[in-house]
Amino acid sequence: MAEAFVSFGLEKLWDLLSRESERLQGIDGQLDGLKRQLRSLQSLLKDADAKKHGSDRVRNFLEDVKDLVFDAEDIIESYVLNKLSGKGKGVKKHVRRLACFLTDRHKVASDIEGITKRISEVIGEMQSFGIQQIIDGGRSLSLQERQRVQREIRQTYPDSSESDLVGVEQSVKELVGHLVENDVHQVVSIAGMGGIGKTTLARQVFHHDLVRRHFDGFAWVCVSQQFTQKHVWQRILQELQPHDGDILQMDEYALQRKLFQLLEAGRYLVVLDDVWKKEDWDVIKAVFPRKRGWKMLLTSRNEGVGIHADPTCLTFRASILNPEESWKLCERIVFPRRDETEVRLDEEMEAMGKEMVTHCGGLPLAVKALGGLLANKHTVPEWKRVFDNIGSQIVGGSWLDDNSLNSVYRILSLSYEDLPTHLKHCFLNLAHFPEDSEISTYSLFYYWAAEGIYDGSTIEDSGEYYLEELVRRNLVIADDNYLSWQSKYCQMHDMMREVCLSKAKEENFLQIIIDPTCTSTINAQSPSRSRRLSIHSGKAFHILGHKNKTKVRSLIVPRFEEDYWIRSASVFHNLTLLRVLDLSWVKFEGGKLPCSIGGLIHLRYLSLYEAKVSHLPSTMRNLKLLLYLNLRVDTEEPIHVPNVLKEMIQLRYLSLPLKMDDKTKLELGDLVNLEYLYGFSTQHSSVTDLLRMTKLRYLAVSLSERCNFETLSSSLRELRNLETLNFLFSLETYMVDYMGEFVLDHFIHLKQLGLAVRMSKIPDQHQFPPHLVHLFLIYCGMEEDPMPILEKLLHLKSVRLARKAFLGSRMVCSKGGFPQLCVIEISKESELEEWIVEEGSMPCLRTLTIDDCKKLKELPDGLKYITSLKELKIEGMKREWKEKLVPGGEDYYKVQHIPDVQFINCDQ
C-alpha cells in the first residue's frame, strides 16, 4: 500500500519536472542527478512493499521515501512559482529581481543536491537490507481509460437500494405494528452491533406506508458519538418545521420550549439514529413530553439506552443474516441484473462465494463490502485470489467473538486494498471529516483535484466517476436525490470510517487534532510525518504556529457547534506549503483575513464559506494556482473584493459574496477555465466577461439596472456547456419587468433554471431551453396563470413556485400536461385561491408540497386520479385542511391512495 502512495507521488513529481522543464533551465545538472536516483528508487518499491508487513525497518524506508518525494516536489514548485511572481518594471526592479533570481537558483540547486544525496543514502540502506530491484513493465490506466472502464461498470450496477433488503421483511412488519397499533410503548429501540443493519431497518420503517399515514410529522436525526444538545434539538425542529427560518437563531431554552409544545400537541415520529450511551439520552430528553402521541424509534449498539429512555421501551434485537441470506445479498451486489433465466454462476465460484460470506459474520455491511469487492471480478482465478486472501488472513468464529470482528474488519479492509491507487487516495481524504458528517460532494471533488488526483478533464465529471466507483464498492454512501436544487452529499458508515481512520494512520496520511492538550490524534506518535491536518476543536488553532507544521499541505476545519477564532495575523506564516485550506464558518479577529494569506502560493483550494470576514487583502493576487475559491462570507455589510481574481486563471470554481460594495469592480474575462460561477453581478463586472467562459456548467447571476435580460442573454450564447442557470434576487431586478426579453431556447444543454426576476407573464414555451428538467420560479410577480405554458415543457421533472411567483387567484393543470413531472412545490403564494387539476394531468407525479398558501380553499379534486403520487406535504395551512384530509374527513377521498401524507404546522 505504501508503495502505491510513493509511486503516486513519484508520478506527480515526474509530471512536474516534465511540465516545467523550460523554467528549470540552469539547474539541469542537479535535476539529471535527481532523476537518476528517482529511477533507481522506483525499481525498488515493489519489493519493499512486499516486505513491509514483516519489517518495521522497511516501513520506515517507505515513509522516508515518501517524505523525500514530497520535499522534492515542494522545492521545485516553490522555485517555479517564485520565478513567475513579481514581474517588476524599470531598471532598478529588474536588477533587484535578477539578483533574487540568481539567489533562488543557487538555493534550489543546493536543495536538490541535498534531496538527491538523501535518496541515494536511502537506496543504499534498502539494498543492504536485501530489497531487490524489480522492473515493472506494466502501466497505470490513463484518466480517460479509467473513466471509460467506470462508465462500463456503472451500466451494470443497481440504482436502487432494494438490493440491501434481504431478510428484513418480517422485522419491518413487526416494528411498524408496534409504532402504529400499539400505544403501550412510547419508545421502540433497535439494538445490535455495528454493521448489522439497524439504520437500514429503521429507514424502511420510517418510510413505510402505514407509518406515513399514521403520524402527522417526521424527524430523523443521527446522534452519533460527538454531538451537542443544541444541534440535536435544532435538527429535530428543522425536520418537523423545515421552513422555519428562525430555528438557527434560537437558544437552547427557546428550542426546548418550542419542541416540547410541538410534540405535546401533535402525533409525530422521531428517529434518533446511533445513540451510543445512556448519558446521551439524558442530554436531549428534556424536549420530550410525558403526554403520549409522539413516538420514538431509536437505534443503538447498547440495548440499555432504549430502556433508560423509557422503562416500557420495546427493544427489538436486529439479527444477523443466516448463510443463505448472506449469499443472497452478496449475489444481488455481484450480479445486480441477473434473473432466473440466465446461466447459473460457475459452481466453483459459487462454492467459494458461499464460503467467503461465512467470514462476514452475518453482518450486511461486511457482506455488501465483499459483494462490491467481487463485483468487478469475473473469472475463477480472480475469485480464487480473494478466497485465498480471506482464508489465510482471518479466522472465522461465532458472530459475537473478537475473531469475527477481526474477520469483518479484514473483509472491509480487503475492499480498500483492492482499490487502485487514485481511489485509495480519494477514500483516505474522507478521514478528515467527523463521524456521520454529510460531506459536500462539490467540495470533495475539488479537494481531490487540489491533491493532484486528477486533472485535464472537468473536475465535476472526474469527481463523479471516482465517487460512483467508491459507492459501487459499498465504501461510501451517496445521497441520491434527483432534485438537483438540493446539495448533494455523501457519508460513511461508522465501521467503514473506522477502516478509513485506521488506514490513514497506517499511511501517516492525516493528523486529526481534537484537543491540543492530549494525544487523541490519528498520528500522535509522529505528527511531523503527516502533511494533512483536520482540526476538530477551536482551541487547537494556536498549534498552527508550531515549526513542526511547516510541511503541512492540507488544513481542513469541519463545522462544529463551537466557534473557531483566528486571532493572529501571522497564523499562515509557517504554512507556506498548503495546497488545501478550508476555513468555512471560521471567525477572524476584526473581520480581517490576514495579509499573510498571500504567502500560500501553492494553494489550490481556499474556502471562506460563511466565515466572519469583512475585509479581503490584495495579497490574494499571489494565489495563482487556485482551482477552487469560495468567498461567500458571512457579513452584514457589503464587502470590498479587490480586483485581483483576474490573475487566478486556473480557477474552475468561484463563488462570490452576495453583498459587494460599490467600489468593487472585478475583471473576470480571463477566467476561461471556470466551470462553476456563483454571484456574478452585472453591477460589479462587465457582462462581456462571460463571453470567453465557454466551459461554464453552472452560473448564478445577479442583474443590475444597467444590464437588461437581452444583453445578458446575447453574452451567454457561447456558453454551450451550461447546465444550470440561476438568476438571483435583487431589489433592482424586482423593479423591472423582464417578460419581453426572455430568450433562452439556444441553451440546448441547460437542465436547471432558477428565475428570481419580475415577469408579468411567463414566456412562451418555445423561449425556454428545449431540454429543461428543473425549474424554480421565485418573486416573479406573474399576473397570468403560468401552468398552460409550463405543462408543455415535456422534459420537466420538478417545478417550484415560491414567494409570490404568481399573483393570480386561479391555476389550472390540464389533461395531458406535465407528462414527466415528478415533483411540484407551491410555497407562499399568498393570492392563490383555486387550483384545478384535470384528470390525466401530471401522470408521473410522486411528491407534492403545498406550503403557506393561506387563501387556497381546498386541495385539487383531481389529485385522486394521480395514482403515482407517493408523498403529500401540507405545511402552514389552516386547521380545516387537516380536518378535511384525515381519515373520516370530507376530502379524505382525494388523498386516501397516497402512502405518505404529512401535516406540518397545520394546527392554527
From Swiss-Prot:
Superkingdom of origin: Eukaryota
GO molecular function: ADP binding; ATP binding; nucleotide binding
Annotated consequence of substituting C426R: In strain: cv. Di-17 and cv. Landsberg erecta
Effect seen on changing P819T: In strain: cv. Landsberg erecta
Effect of V283R: In strain: cv. Di-17
Compartments in which it is found: Cell membrane
Pfam families: LRR_14 (PF23598), NB-ARC (PF00931), Rx_N (PF18052), WH_DRP (PF23559)
Effect of W399C: In strain: cv. Di-17 and cv. Landsberg erecta
GO biological process: cellular response to salicylic acid stimulus; defense response; defense response to virus; plant-type hypersensitive response; positive regulation of defense response to virus by host; response to absence of light; response to blue light; response to light stimulus
Coiled coil regions, renumbered to chain: 15-57
Gene3D superfamilies the UniProt entry points to: 1.20.5.4130, Helical domain of apoptotic protease-activating factors, P-loop containing nucleotide triphosphate hydrolases, Ribonuclease Inhibitor, Winged helix-like DNA-binding domain superfamily/Winged helix DNA-binding domain
Effect of F768L: In strain: cv. Landsberg erecta
Record GO cellular component, one term: plasma membrane
Keywords assigned by UniProt, alphabetized: ATP-binding, Cell membrane, Coiled coil, Hypersensitive response, Leucine-rich repeat, Membrane, Nucleotide-binding, Plant defense, Repeat
Description of what induces expression: By salicylic acid (SA). Induced by Hyaloperonospora arabidopsidis, benzothiadiazole (BTH) and wounding. Degraded in darkness and in blue-light.
Effect of R697Q: In strain: cv. Di-17
Extra facts: In cv. Columbia and cv. Landsberg erecta, RPP8 specifically recognizes the Emco5 avirulence protein from Hyaloperonospora parasitica, while it is not the case in cv. Di-17, where it confers resistance to Turnip Crinkle Virus upon recognition of the viral capsid protein.
Known role: Disease resistance protein. Resistance proteins guard the plant against pathogens that contain an appropriate avirulence protein via an indirect interaction with this avirulence protein. That triggers a defense system including the hypersensitive response, which restricts the pathogen growth. The interaction with TIP (TCV-interacting protein) may be essential for the recognition of the avirulence proteins, and the triggering of the defense response. Triggers resistance to turnip crinkle virus (TCV) via a SAG101-dependent pathway.
UniProt-recorded name of the protein: Disease resistance protein RPP8
Species for this entry: Arabidopsis thaliana (Mouse-ear cress)
